[in-house]
Regions:
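Beta-barrel outer-membrane channel/assembly domains of diderm bacteria
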Residues: 1-102, 137-139, 273, 309-312, ...
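Short loop/turn motifs that connect adjacent beta-strands in outer-membrane beta-barrel proteins
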Residues: 1-9, 49-62, 98-106, 140-147, ...
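Transmembrane beta-barrel outer-membrane domains
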Residues: 2-4, 37-43, 83-90, 125-129, ...
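Detector for outer-membrane/organellar transmembrane beta-barrel domains
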Residues: 175, 180-333, 342-346, 352, ...
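A broadly tuned preference for mixed-charge, low-complexity surface segments
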Residues: 50-59, 66, 118-121, 156-172, ...
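Transmembrane beta-strands of outer-membrane beta-barrel pores
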Residues: 15-21, 66-70, 111-115, 150-156, ...
């Protein structure tokens, strides 16, 4: 076996320490209110990859990644009687140069993060069909490129039966077209994801939740260069087990735990990063989601979320950061009742980063946050309070 000449090392981390008005730092609805000053975990990803073969236009690249998550509460956090969890996130082979006429097209197989679309300030991937699979991506077709993948994303523990397997095999066909530019400074991407629950004969005999039907999610997005930044609008439609993603800030997981064969939903997202001045910029995410019949007792669910993060650079390395978020969600039930959720978050932070760009990392932040449940849900202080505060220090990095 020949020695591998070079190894690419990439990763991500976030970690810190904080307190709230009642004990350790609180985390509440961060995917709808914003993540700044609203994260209480320790999380990391370590990725190693290498081009193990290269000749002319032909390249074989191996990639791997493991992840770790814990609550950061102790010195030595292990998987034995502690809360640390380790995961295998990526392990795949990517081959270039074997498709005639398109040396940049990729044939791949294995386990991987697959073309995930991220809303960073709310820590959400709104288009995320990742897992074990295979496919061809970035094959040039007209003004853009097409990608086709088969990816597995099973549903586990569908119910509590003990007389058979409660894990259901689900396969996705993911088809995307990206790169078409309808006018100067714009770019687009379109895709269809088709999810197919693949039950066994024994599971078919159970009926009920195991009678789930194939579902579809359609995504279209257009982005535009704007004032030195960008703006993006996303439209999505989903049905069956994929419909709940439209109101849960999900990216494409299939719900097998509810009766969803009549479910439909749609979502509109607008996001952007705009430099207002040379030193001040704003990143925002607006989400409106609607879904019907996502459980056997739910009629309609509506969700609205708006988060904005502003950043002012004092120097190349020191910045003031503010983040404001709010959301409203209403679940209307078939019996005529409803359940409302709503809240706000306000955060101010001093950031120390390795450059003046909005997304410059690594970054250390000293933050203070106020969180409020405006629908009297009492999620804080052992379910006795509608609001609380956080104070702490967090670091975040990717490389």
């Amino acid at each position: 076996t020949a020695a591998i000449p070079t190894v690419d090392f990439h990763g991500y981390l976030r970690a810190g320490v904080g307190v709230s008005g009642d004990g350790s730092e609180a985390e509440w609805q961060k995917n709808k209110l914003g993540r700044l000053g609203n994260e209480s975990d320790t999380y990391g990803e370590l990725e190693l990859g290498s081009e193990v073969y290269k000749k002319d236009d032909v390249s074989f690249y191996l990639d791997s990644m493991v992840s770790m998550v814990s609550d950061g509460s102790n010195d030595n956090e292990t998987t034995l009687n502690d809360d640390a969890q380790f995961g295998l996130r990526q392990l795949n082979l990517q081959i270039k140069g074997l498709i005639p006429g398109d040396p940049n097209a990729v044939i791949w197989g294995g386990k991987r993060y697959y073309q995930r679309h991220d809303l960073h300030i709310i820590d959400t991937k709104y288009w995320n069909i990742s897992g074990s699979g295979a496919g061809v991506e970035n094959y040039t077709l007209g003004p853009g490129a097409v990608s086709l993948a088969w990816i597995r994303g099973d549903a586990n523990d569908v119910d509590y039966r003990v007389d058979g397997d409660s894990n259901v095999n689900i396969n996705y066909i993911d088809l995307r077209y990206a790169g078409w530019k309808p006018w100067s400074g714009s770019w687009t991407e379109f895709g269809i994801d088709y999810a197919m629950p693949n039950t066994t004969k024994k599971q078919d005999s159970y009926g009920g939740l195991y009678d789930a039907e194939n579902g579809v999610m359609l995504t279209g997005e257009i982005s535009q260069d704007m004032l030195g930044g960008y703006n993006k609008t996303v439209l999505q439609y989903a049905n069956k087990g994929l419909a709940q993603n439209m109101v849960s800030q999900g990216g494409g997981w299939y719900d097998m735990w509810n009766y969803v064969n009549d479910a439909t939903g749609y979502r509109v997202i607008n996001t952007g990063l705009i430099p207002i001045t040379e030193k001040f910029s704003i990143n925002h995410v607006l989400t409106w989601g609607s879904a019907d019949d996502i459980t056997d007792y739910t009629d309609k669910t509506r969700m609205l979320s708006l988060v904005a993060r502003g950043q002012y650079q004092f120097t190349d390395y020191v910045r003031l950061i503010g983040e404001v978020g709010g959301f409203y969600q209403k679940d209307s039930y078939n019996n005529g009742t409803s359940y409302k959720q709503a809240g706000e978050k306000y955060t101010i932070a001093l950031g120390l980063a390795d450059g003046p760009d909005f997304m410059s990392r690594p970054e250390l932040r000293i933050f203070a946050s106020y969180l409020n449940d405006s629908e009297d849900g009492k999620p804080f202080e052992d379910q006795t309070a509608n609001n609380t505060w956080n104070f702490g220090v967090q670091v975040e990095a990717w490389w």
